[in-house]
Amino acid sequence: MTIFDAVAKAIVPSVTHAIEENNKNREIQEKRQKETKDRNDRMVQNQKDRKEMIGLTNEKQTYSNSVKNAKTDNEKKIFQNLLDKTNSRITDIEKRQSGDISEYKRLVEENKNLEKNVKEFKEVMKPFEENDIIHNPKHVDEDTIEENKKKMEDIKEVLGFTKTAANGGLPPNHDEDNKKIAELKKKYDDVKNHGHSNSGGLVGSVFNAIVPSVKENLRNAELENIQKEIKQTEDKISNDDKFYNTYKLTDDERKQFGSNPGDPQATPTPTPTPTPTPTPTPTPTTTTTTTTTPKPTTTTTTTSTTTPTKTSTNTNDKPGIFETVGGGSGKVADALNPIRIVTGGAIFSDTMEKIGGGSGKLADEGVEAVGSGISNFAQSVGIIPKKQEPKKDENNNQSNNNNNNNQAGDDQNKNQNRDENNQGGENNQGGENNQDGENNQNGDENNQGGENNQGDENNQGGENNQGDQNNQDGGENNQDGGENNQDGHGNNQDGENNQDGGENNQDSGENNQDGGENNQDGGENNQDGGENNQDGGENNQDGGENNQDGGENNQDGENNQDGENNQENNRDGENNQDGGENNQDGGENNQDGENNQDGGENNQDDGENKQDGGENNQDGGENNQDDGENNQDGENNQDGGENNQDGDENNQDSGENNQDSGENNQDGGENNQDGDENNQDGGENNQDGENNQNGENNQDGGENNQDGENNQDGENNQDGGENNQDGGENNQDGGEDNQDGGENNQEGGEDNQDGGEDNQDGGEDNQDGGENNQGDENNQDVDENNQDGENNQDGDENNQDGENNQDGENNQDGDENNNQDGEQNQDGDENNQDGGENNQDGDENNNQDGDENNNQDGGENNQDGGENNQDGDENNNQDGGENNQDGENNQDGDENNNQDGEQNQDGDENNQEGDENNNQGDDENNNQDGDENNNQDGDENNQDGDENNQDGDENNQGNDENNQDGDQNNQGGDENNQDGDGENNQGDENNQDGGENNQDGGENNQDQDGSENNQGNNENNQGGDENNQDQDGGENNQGNDENNQGGDENNQGNENDQGGDENNQGGDENTNQEENGGNDE
């Protein structure tokens, strides 16, 4: 009989199927580990690609402008040739990255099957727990007793095979025992010839001299003990050999369970030797103790006095049989209990207790092996004589359920490894105190969101660091949300939900932006939330149907974040999501990383190596993380959608290919976005800040509010990974399939969302938990109707991106003192900010958002928005609104005034990132970022949507059915240059997003658009004229300057650029808002 035959016979035939499934799962897990490594290797390659793309992007911008400004056909031809070559290299890199996305989809699919297998396995085990015979051993008839006797014999056989397998199927190694016997024999001779070994010394000499007979008595007693010990060791060798021969494995079994035939012998499981009887003598003996680890001896009795020891003898680094066959904790010792062997540990441990108690630790061969309690059962039915009870107790107490550390303990273990692979990290997983917690979650074993950091081991979601001390993405107190709000405070949400875009599109991707082609931040039906869950995925994602990234009271909360209760379906909900395999998007105190987050180590709204998490953590504020104290991405919903999240049914906040990240970047994106190596909201070294993203000390967030007074989706997805941001390698905030949700899982991936391959922002069972529960059943990112929808998140009618801040009243994307993206700059490098290497959003000669020849706010390919547009759709802009956008009242969604500040930023009624009549894109009536009637980032009625759909409309959010947060292809200006707006500043004192000292706003204001001190209208200007600057807020200026901003003859609106290019927004020949309404080609 093979081990499988024995197992099947002893338990139930259907278990064989479960065992096979578990074996398959094991293979899948190993395969996935390899794939994780491969993916990390690809990340390194992608980082190299990203650096190359930065250069290529700048080249493309330069050549494109040169083609446009060429004075002769020959000159034009030369530059066109250079431009074609550059585009070809960019395409090669993009193709390579798109392969990663399809690979990710495959992994997601595989993980679904894995989950299915686990569920099936649990089903197979149900009959054991429901069997009355097991529950009521006293009410059994004679036939049942006979049947149970046989069953015990079979179980005994299972144990025998199990032990042999535990030793790799190899014969016992007697080297230690033989060595011990030799030493004992030598000792015997010494004692015999020289007397009792401890009879020396002055006291001994006197003693021996006075009482000669004592010496002889001691010697004889010791000789007798030595002989006994020699015999016991010899018996042990004999028993071990006999046992091995009885339960020998076949070659195939040996291959499967550890050692191949011919392999060196595995280290044998140490065997216990009984403690020798103490010698009655006052003289201490030193020879009666042994150093071998106890192991059950193979006696034929049913009880034993040896203490079982858990030891792993698997020297091949292969899973032990226990894990292979059924799981357990993976420790060989666990496996030594048939229950666990067959059923996978905790799942069946109840049954063991029901059969007879005990946690299933193996006391010894025989009846007790099944669990101490089985002895009680056996006695009750007459199988075992009651006289053996004392020994039984002595042996088995230690296996008692309560005493066992919950290793197989009923309740505690039930979802401790609810699925060994996911759940926010093997050890912490939504633990009450650490989940996303003190030590790892949000940053487990492999990183999640960043190869090396994301939720680093010690802080991510750690109790004390959340959003580094220097803050980052939010400042000391808020980070991506800030202490009180972040990512969806009660009043705003999706604050900078997607600002920060990718190479091609900004916060969305080439084809969609924060929403995808069809919607944005919500999708046609669900907006930033989806019909049922948003930012949660089909079932829950980032919260799931019932909870998601937050919940009314805790979100990513203090104690359970990412986990206290962990429900299978709420992901990023009550217990997980926003956590990922290793977790992410969480952590009590750190969130959004120690030094960079929303930017990564050196750059890009995410950082070279990490993602939405910064070196050590990720997306999560002290109290609420990725959600805000009360709601998270909206009280009731959250970035996501039934299928997509933060976007259309198919894409949202990412789009099939990108969104909130885009295929290649966005919100960090591979090449830039809010922090490309050389430009875009950051630059390699400063990204959104001098040194790290959104400012030296804080990041896209500011001390108190991060992206808004209270938060603003903090930088909900700025925050991104190399390719994806807030998500995984390939999907930001989700990736192709999950970005901030993605088609299937939103903010995390189908199964893990904002979290990792297996568990989304927290793991299957725990999600961005929150103090009380994260992702309350009724609100978390999931209400059917509001999700990022009617009532809030990314587009509430009254607040979204909220009433009080969203990139808001005081700063947005910046601390009060540090403002927007960094102490020195934000949204840009010291020299370039929000864009070009040297200028970005504000250099006198070269700024973005308006330079005569060259601006950025996106750059040709990225511009805070994407290749084709950003900062506004053709027909309905974003980032603007007559009164605020990103503003005092809301942004990204207020009925009458949205996004971009009281005066509005990046979109005042009269100017908005451009002149009333010409900005961005040069079209008089039609530009982005500024047309009175028609731009994104600023239309009176539509801004980031339309009254009905803005990033939050009941039906589509994010703008228009087809474009979202701006143009079909972009967005980004808005949220990106919302970037301030606030009544008091946005835009650090030193400002950012602008000149060396001011960035997008002038010394005192910065991309603040509308600040009391004006911003953008500064003497030093920024992003625009000498006197004005991307201020988008001065009543009449912004881009209205002599040199103009976002609308000059030669710029913005570069061929491939934003704000007016052939393909873009802001009014080009093909996109004319009036004609296309943001449905750019």
Swiss-Prot record:
GO terms for biological process: cheating during chimeric sorocarp development. It comes from the Eukaryota. Residues 22-53, 411-421 have a biased composition (Basic and acidic residues). Residues 22-60, 250-321, 388-1081 are annotated as: Disordered. Keywords: Coiled coil, Repeat. Signal peptide: none annotated. Residues 284-313, 396-410, 422-568, 576-602, 614-623, 633-644, 662-672, 680-733, 855-869, 877-888, 955-975, 983-1026, 1034-1081 have a biased composition (Low complexity). Residues 18-131, 173-242 form a coiled coil. Residues 748-768, 778-832, 840-854, 889-954 have a biased composition (Acidic residues). The keyword Coiled coil applies. The keyword Repeat applies. Residues 267-283 have a biased composition (Pro residues). Contains about 100 repeats of the sequence DGENNQ or DGGENNQ. This is Uncharacterized protein DDB_G0290685. It comes from Dictyostelium discoideum (Social amoeba). The lineage of its organism: Eukaryota, Amoebozoa, Evosea, Eumycetozoa, Dictyostelia.
